[in-house]
């Protein structure tokens, strides 16, 4: 089967918005190629293996979308271009925006992204292992089996990496964890393997919910429940930890609601915040939470806070 590959060159800031537009237009798959992520991992002591072919020049990211050939494909591509340009009106920098279109075979793209995803060690003992890769654990390493599919969350993105580092320090044996906007389920699965008693993971996107469920099953976990929810809407009870790796606007919305779902002195781990909006997010969080620590990496920051 033939597919249309649409390659969009843009900025890291626009990455998530561009990806969302592609999914909304019916892309059969989306691949993000970010050479800056590879460089950051290479400079860190906390990585296991990166193939030499991944080291490319720094620069803008490339987002690839794959659409089945149909009568309306050209219209979809034009809409995609218009909507990406429109992002500028929302204050999102799209950089030297460029679009390239080509025709490819299904076999060429459906596994293409896997070459950029290798076993990765994060923090002191967390290892994210693609389900198709071989890896022998060493010492007390915790192996997270993952097949992200079309959902966000592989461990290579700065926001996910910082969340994992925080979780390694804050998850306790009796912890109840709420994962809001769970994506691939990577944070929920890690929380469980770090010893959490119960983990509840939700996403508004049905594809993410299904991918997360598959990854929970892949890791043979019984204490992680995955369901569809618009933010905290379908969660019940109270948690010791709420983790949300989303975007700044959603973190701001959550800041007033999260305390109702947290136990006394519960922790709120918020990520997906672009550095330029850190101050704004902090101002919205502080009426409800005491900020304990902030991590920064690349263009992103992650905030750990405690319920007042």
Swiss-Prot record:
This is Ribosomal protein L11 methyltransferase. One of its GO terms (cellular component) is cytoplasm. It comes from the Bacteria. Belongs to the methyltransferase superfamily. PrmA family. It is an enzyme of class 2 (transferase). One of its GO terms (biological process) is methylation. It is found in: Cytoplasm. The keyword Methyltransferase applies. Pfam families: PrmA (PF06325). It comes from Thermoanaerobacter sp. (strain X514). Its EC number is 2.1.1.-. S-adenosyl-L-methionine binds at residues 160, 181, 203, 245. Methylates ribosomal protein L11. Keywords: Cytoplasm, Methyltransferase, S-adenosyl-L-methionine, Transferase. It catalyses: L-lysyl-[protein] + 3 S-adenosyl-L-methionine = N(6),N(6),N(6)-trimethyl-L-lysyl-[protein] + 3 S-adenosyl-L-homocysteine + 3 H(+). GO terms for molecular function: protein-lysine N-methyltransferase activity.
